[in-house]
Each structure stands twice: as structure tokens, then as C-alpha cells.
């Protein structure tokens, strides 16, 4: 009885599955046909992923073993990148040895390794589902390998309908995907540019006051210029101005400057900054809690203060540099040198500031995106 039931169930099950797969494949072909693409079937023997890669790059699926060895070797050489993604606690060496055997199915790690070792991006087409992209290279000239994925168990190669299949696959461009990618990059670039521009244009009048008090610098224009260079960071601006004054003092050798230094009141330079700075900080906090001042008001205010204070050129410069005004802040060179000095010293200043505050800055990674292993 058991044997009879088993014989009856076989003919019913097989044609039903075959009909369903044929229907899915027909639907899949129609989906790709709308994009101007066609499926190039490869042998389903456990090597299908490597066969599809070989067809895309050489036009010969029989070269599958060459690409299997190439991909496994890349995984072995980049163990620290791939080992954390091996499942079921399988030892790394055992995994690589098994993957190198003929007929072993490829997984997500092999997809990523194939993209990196062939320096190609990969597009995976799925039946009635969005396309998957493994995009490790942003250069528009990078080759795009096109594969189709069937029922979670088989890969085929995908080519343009006009491709004669006489060699490597011809380049395929899916216009909808290209437009989305370009629009996304442009939007990110525009957002970043506008944010940086807005941050640099706005300098709070209270921040200028705090910087001038903390650094004993009476030159409003110089204080504002430094604040712009450090993106409004009050502590960094104060540290820079103090360091700038110290550097100028060390390089001052002429006797004329030495005699002028006798007129400076040392007590004022050492006692008053702390008190003035604390008071100015409190005023700045109150101002920021209320409505913010716009950049035009700040510029008008700074210009008025500069015009009201006309300093004789032969007098000692009020910025505390111990030099005459005409050879310090009163010259175009003195004003323009601030920008260069800021760029040379800001990294060390920001490092000290972070240690003091106990905070960490967000770092924008410039290194290239290596894509996702788990897709």
C-alpha cells in the first residue's frame, strides 16, 4: 500500500512544479524584456553563480572554476573582512576549503568578494521584486555585472537583447536606476554645500565679544575673521588669537618694539581677561536663548565699531602683539595672515578642546564604501 501511494504521488508532483517554474520563468523573461534585457541560462550544477560571472566577463561559462578560485583566494587574503560573517561557527579555513570545492553553492560573501576582486558592481534581477545592487565603486565607468536570481537557488546571466553573446557582456544601462542614483548624489552634495555656507556666514555678535575679551584683542575685524575660519568656535578662536600673539612676540627683535612694550600694562593683560570673559559668556548665553541676530546686523555692528576706533599708526597695536599698529593689524598683510595661520594650527586646537570638554566629533569617513555583505 505504501509503495502504491508513493508511485501515485510522483507523477502529480513533478509536472505541477515544472509548470510553476516555467510560468515564473516566462513572467521573469517578460519583466526583463521591458528593460531591453534577456536571460542567458547557465548549467545548474552548484557552480551557477561562478558560471554566470564567467559568462558576463568572458562569454564562456566553462571558465567558472577560474573565477571560483579567484574569489576564494580573495576571501582568504582578506580574512579580517570576511571571517565575522561566516555563520554556524564554521572555522574560517574549513569554510574556504569547502567553498573552493566544485559544486559548492555561493553565498552573500562570494557576491561581495566577486565585486571587489573583479572591480565590478553587481546588479541582481529578481522576479517581480526590486533589483539588488552591490555598488562598491562610484566611478561611472565601472563595469556592471548583471545576474538573475531564481527561486533562491539558481543564478543566470543577464544581457542586452541586442547582445550576440560572442564574448563579454555588452554594457547595460537601466535609465531609471541611473537617474535615481544621480539625483541622490546631487541632493546630498547640494545639502552639504548649503549647510557649510550657512554656518560660515553667521557670526554672533556676542561670540565676537567673548573672543575679544578672552584674548585681549581689541580688533573686531580680526576676531570676526578668526571666528569665521573656525566655524564660530569661541574657544578655538580665543586659543588661536592668544597663540598668534605669543608667536609674534617671540619673533619680535627690533629695539623699537622693545621700547614700545614698556607702555603696555601687564596687569590689565593678565587680570582682566578671565573676569571679562566669564561676564561676556553669560551675556552670550542670554542672547542665544532669545531671538538670534541675523548676519547683516552683525556685519553692520562690527563695521561701526571699527570706524569709531581710529588708532594712530605709530601707537602700540591694541591686539597685544607688542608691535606698532602700522606694522601689525593696521596692514593688509596682518589682516590676511590670520587665515593662513588658522589653517595651520586649527587641528591641534580642536584636539585640545575635545580633550577638555570630553566630547567627540563626528568624523565623515572619506574612505570608499565597501558595500553590504548581507543583502
Curated annotation (Swiss-Prot):
Primary gene name: OTU7
Reaction(s) this enzyme catalyzes, per UniProt: Thiol-dependent hydrolysis of ester, thioester, amide, peptide and isopeptide bonds formed by the C-terminal Gly of ubiquitin (a 76-residue protein attached to proteins as an intracellular targeting signal)
Domain OTU: 37-161
CDD domains in the cross-refs: OTU_plant_OTU7-like (cd22771)
Places the protein is found: Nucleus
Gene3D superfamilies: 3.10.450.50, 3.90.70.80
Name this protein carries in UniProt: OVARIAN TUMOR DOMAIN-containing deubiquitinating enzyme 7
Enzyme class: hydrolase
Residues at the active site: 45, 48, 154
Task of the protein: Hydrolase that can remove conjugated ubiquitin from proteins in vitro and may therefore play an important regulatory role at the level of protein turnover by preventing degradation. Cysteine protease with a preference for 'Lys-63' over 'Lys-48' over 'Met-1' -linked ubiquitin (UB) tetramers as substrates. Also cleaves RUB-GST fusion.
Origin superkingdom: Eukaryota
Activity-pH dependence: Optimum pH is 7.
PANTHER family cross-referenced by the UniProt entry: OTU DOMAIN CONTAINING PROTEIN, OTU DOMAIN-CONTAINING PROTEIN 3
Compositional bias annotation for Polar residues: 251-264, 290-305
Gene Ontology BP, a term: proteolysis
UniProt domain UBA-like: residue ranges: 202-250
Record motif Nuclear localization signal, residues: 308-315
Primary location class: nucleus
GO molecular function, one term: cysteine-type deubiquitinase activity
GO cellular component terms given for this protein: nucleus
Region called Disordered, residue ranges: 1-23, 251-306
Enzyme Commission number: 3.4.19.12
Pfam families: OTU (PF02338), SEC-C (PF02810)
